[in-house]
Amino acid sequence: MKKIKVLCVDDSALVRGLMTEIINSHPDMEVVATAPDPLVARELIKKHNPDVLTLDVEMPRMDGLDFLEKLMRLRPMPVVMVSSLTERGGEITLRALELGAIDFVTKPKLGIRDGLIEYSEVIADKIRAASRARLRALAPASHAAPLRLRSPFASSEKLVIVGASTGGTEAIREVLQPLPADSPAILITQHMLAGFTRSFAQRLDALCAVTVREASDGERVLPGHVYLAPGGETHMRLGRSGANYVIGLQASEPVNRHRPSVDVLFHSAAEAAGGNAIGVILTGMGKDGAAGLLAMKRAGARTMAQDEASCVVFGMPREAIALGAADEVVPLADISERILTRLGDRGHRV
């Protein structure tokens, strides 16, 4: 079996050693080299031609983001960022994902050895997914305002329910940016750790006509608003309070190894919204959301899955399609328009 070749770049010798220990403990991957900074890494990339790079975001001699941007322009390769769990770390990590990084893992604030070893399976899963990921070309920065679509109508009854994982931060941005301010309410579960979703919501809010926020327990769901499940600690559910939709956040065990889980949100939407919802499953590894999307379809919702060609990782959509949960398979660039088209359809389903 061919092993996944990994190059670890981090200014901390402790982190380099721990990452090497963790990665080499899995039989399908190995660390071929480590580097204390991007300048050393540049030479090691030429020498070893690694399959995946793990990259610290803050390092001496060259900033991790600067190096990532140069790398994705000149020698694109799968990168998993290693970030500190701070507000600044969250903002930098989101920028790294925009620049083309596949995913990220966090350094624990205290007890770094125990924290990273506890993350062993997560780190290995992310490296495996990165090794199979479809790289996005880094487009030149554009300052033009995004083209806004027109909503066929505004209704407090209609809802869009979205789930995503690896590659999802950029996919979600691409879905939300064209939507008009009077779009129906949108609920999103993106696999993300605590401490990152608030920064992600703020970044999206600045880019989109719709209002984007991190969801709060018990809040009423309003048209023109996007509610992002908080990372790490709870599952997000859709419920009813009289004539209104409301959000529930529940601290319970992970589902499909994830918290928040897409399946939890989708199953709750099937029960609370039925045929008034549209379910969308985007890029991501694993199967979270597939069964929930099928439940939504059976409850009368329109459902769609992102197509393989536009996915960073075609895991969750593939599982949903295999179950027969997706009414249609749609390229990422067309999903916003398809959502609005479905909202305008007449019949027993949105």
Curated annotation (Swiss-Prot):
EC numbers: 3.1.1.61, 3.5.1.44
Family matches, as SUPFAM superfamilies: CheY-like, Methylesterase CheB, C-terminal domain
Domain Response regulatory: 5-122
Primary enzyme class: hydrolase
Residue numbers of 4-aspartylphosphate PTMs: 56
Origin: domain of life: Bacteria
Keyword Phosphoprotein: yes
Assigned GO CC terms: cytoplasm
Location (main, coarse): cytoplasm
GO molecular function term, any single one: phosphorelay response regulator activity
BP term (GO), one: chemotaxis
Post-translational modification: Phosphorylated by CheA. Phosphorylation of the N-terminal regulatory domain activates the methylesterase activity.
Annotated compartments: Cytoplasm
Swiss-Prot/TrEMBL keywords: Chemotaxis, Cytoplasm, Hydrolase, Phosphoprotein
Role of this protein: Involved in chemotaxis. Part of a chemotaxis signal transduction system that modulates chemotaxis in response to various stimuli. Catalyzes the demethylation of specific methylglutamate residues introduced into the chemoreceptors (methyl-accepting chemotaxis proteins or MCP) by CheR. Also mediates the irreversible deamidation of specific glutamine residues to glutamic acid.
Sequence similarity: Belongs to the CheB family.
Domain comment as written in the entry: Contains a C-terminal catalytic domain, and an N-terminal region which modulates catalytic activity.
Record's protein name: Protein-glutamate methylesterase/protein-glutamine glutaminase
Gene: cheB
